[in-house]
Design a protein with these regions (language model features):
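Conserved structural-core and active-site-/substrate-pathway-adjacent residues in large, well-folded domains
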Residues: 3, 52-55, 102, 170, ...
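Long hydrophobic segments that form regular secondary structure
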Residues: 51-54, 60-62, 67
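Short glycine-rich anion-binding loops that position phosphate/pyrophosphate groups of nucleotides
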Residues: 57-60, 87, 105-106, 140-141
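Structural motif
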Residues: 21-23, 50-54, 82, 100, ...
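Conserved phosphate-binding/catalytic region of the ribokinase-like
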Residues: 29, 48, 65-80, 85-95, ...
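Conserved N-terminal subdomain of the carbohydrate kinase-like
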Residues: 1-53, 208-230
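Short, basic, glycine/proline-bearing loop/turn elements
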Residues: 23-26, 55-57, 104-109
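Non-cysteine beta-strand/loop elements that form the S-adenosyl-L-methionine
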Residues: 96-104
């Protein structure tokens, strides 16, 4: 069970905004038996799934063996896998179709790899771990897609007044799963993920959700931007 705390100071800001997030959970890892049971349960649900999202909190729920077995089984079944990995457990994501990163995380790996820029770091990581693509979430800096074939696409953030960013990973993972699971291309999936992230950035609070009309407006704006930039 994870307990989440939020803190902020409204006197310093024009609007209320989350400044601090602290998560508290059990310190001990789960037993291997529980992890194996959860993996087996996920494996049995593959036939009824159109996509798989694996999110690693490094608490023992997702082991390297379990993650790789799910990725292989999904690949054999033609089911796309979206992975939200820990930087210290990238081996668990080997072979995933799409991997989520924050811009700060990629910057850290860039320094570790001594790459000249984030593009080179992304290329190195994609080749090393055999990913299909990497989607980098930059918040107000937009979303960048790096693909195994070398193609790169950047989607700038068009949110007029970004308020918060709690939930970006969940929004992006859900959008990728919905798009890839319904047979859309990786670029289309990244576009939907960017729109979902902008909805989160513009939400009054992390519990606020948008309807289909609002999301459609974001997608129309992104489509127009891509059209005028010949992307």
């Amino acid at each position: 069970t994870k307990i989440r705390f939020y803190g902020g100071r409204e006197s310093l800001l024009d609007k209320s905004q989350i400044l601090l997030q602290a998560d508290r959970g059990p310190g001990e890892e789960l037993t291997e038996g529980i992890s194996a049971s959860l993996t087996a349960s996920a494996m049995s649900s593959l036939s009824d799934s159109c996509a798989i999202v694996l999110s690693d909190y490094d608490k023992g729920v997702l082991t390297t063996e379990g993650a790789l077995s799910l990725i292989k089984a999904a690949g054999d079944a033609g089911i796309p896998v979206i992975m939200d990995p820990k930087l210290t457990g990238l081996e668990k994501s080997r072979g995933a179709d799409a991997v989520l990163f924050e811009i700060r995380g990629l910057g850290l790996l860039q320094r570790r790899l001594m790459a000249s820029d984030q593009s080179e770091a992304a290329k190195n990581l994609i080749e090393t771990y055999e990913w299909g693509a990497m989607l980098v979430l930059g918040g107000v800096h937009g979303v960048t897609l790096y693909q195994a074939d070398g193609e790169t696409m950047h989607l700038p953030c068009s949110a007029v007044a970004p308020i918060q960013q709690i939930g970006l990973h969940d929004a992006a993972a859900t959008a990728l799963a919905a798009a890839l699971g319904n047979g859309h291309s990786m670029t289309d999936a990244a576009t939907l993920a960017a729109a979902a992230c902008e909805c989160v950035l513009s939400a009054e609070a992390s519990h606020e959700f948008v309807n289909r009309t609002t999301l459609g407006v974001w997608l129309d704006e992104l489509a127009w931007q891509l059209q005028i930039s010949d992307r």
